[in-house]
Design a protein with these regions (language model features):
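Nuclease-adjacent, charged terminal/linker segments that flank catalytic cores
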Residues: 1-97, 101-102, 272-274
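Non-catalytic C-terminal interaction segments of nucleic acid-processing enzymes
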Residues: 16-19, 162, 175, 179-183, ...
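Soluble or luminal CAZymes and related metallo-dependent hydrolases
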Residues: 48, 110-114, 180
Length: 274
């Protein structure tokens, strides 16, 4: 079968998974995207991956930003035409809201890349069951009557030693204004779809600042360092601001009561409580 000059036939098992991953990530580096294809088993050859990406960029389905500050790598996002195509095939996205235009969202690039790394760490360890990204969350919140209390960065389902556990995730690379955290703390009592919120933050100062707004929260909110997630995953220490105690994340997810005894060696360092 012949196709019009300049057209592209999308491969169901290779091209479409690539486009879906870029859409769900919103922004993703070249190296991150290749690792996603490896871990999700839909591309094995690096040369084939390079060829496929050049093809998608050349046909205008993928937008490429070269050497975005702070990444040292090319960064991809989907073009509006590709997002519309994926939406027609059942993907959750809000094409009409301008959220797929790279030109309008450069400030979110590093945030999205950081979220990709959080997801990849769980994938590498075989812990990730499902990652519901911000685009799918926004779609559910804006288009249905059963939305979450806020637009989280992700809803994450992981495997623990006693079963699957789900939690909302917020990644704070830089702090927001105080009024934003007050609003978040106020709305969390309305959350009915997920029963844990984890804040991963870039450093101790942000942890102290953000956690201070949740000291009276009834809803379970935990705080931890991004570096600890990448090093220890479910064994990472998290802070419960209500008890002012640190304990392993898996204990928080499993609903166990914090104990006074020392944590395992990998998580024995202290988090700031005050």
């Amino acid at each position: 079968m012949r196709y019009p000059k300049g057209s592209i036939q999308l491969n169901q098992s290779r091209d479409l998974p690539l486009l879906r991953q870029i859409l769900r990530s919103e922004f993703v580096t070249h190296s991150q995207l290749f690792e996603f294809t490896q871990l999700n088993h839909y591309e094995r050859s690096r040369n084939s991956f390079h060829w496929r990406m050049r093809r998608l960029v050349d046909r205008g389905l993928v937008l490429r930003q070269t050497l975005v500050a702070g990444t040292g790598d090319a960064v991809y996002s989907v073009a509006s035409s590709a997002a519309t195509l994926l939406q027609s095939m059942g993907e959750y996205c809000l094409v009409g809201c301008g959220r797929t235009d790279a030109e309008k969202a450069n400030r979110n690039v590093l945030h999205a890349i950081g979220l990709n790394e959080i997801q990849l760490s769980a994938l590498r360890a075989g812990l990730l069951v499902r990652w519901m990204g911000s685009m799918e969350i926004r779609s559910q919140n804006e288009l249905t009557a059963f939305g979450f209390a806020k637009d989280y960065d992700a809803i994450v389902t992981v495997r623990t030693d006693i079963g699957e556990r789900r939690f909302a995730l917020e990644y704070e690379r830089t702090p927001k204004a105080a009024k934003c955290y007050r609003a978040i703390a106020a709305c969390m009592s309305q959350e009915v779809h997920v029963n844990r919120l984890l804040y991963l933050v870039a450093n101790y100062d942000i942890l102290r600042f953000v956690s201070g707004f949740f000291t009276k929260a009834v809803y379970p909110v935990f705080f931890g360092l991004l570096t600890d997630w990448h090093s220890y995953l479910l064994e990472m220490p998290v802070l419960d601001v209500l008890t002012k105690r640190a304990f392993p994340l898996k204990q928080a997810l499993n609903g166990a009561t914090p104990k006074a005894e020392a944590m395992p060696t990998a998580t024995s360092h202290r988090l700031p409580f005050h």
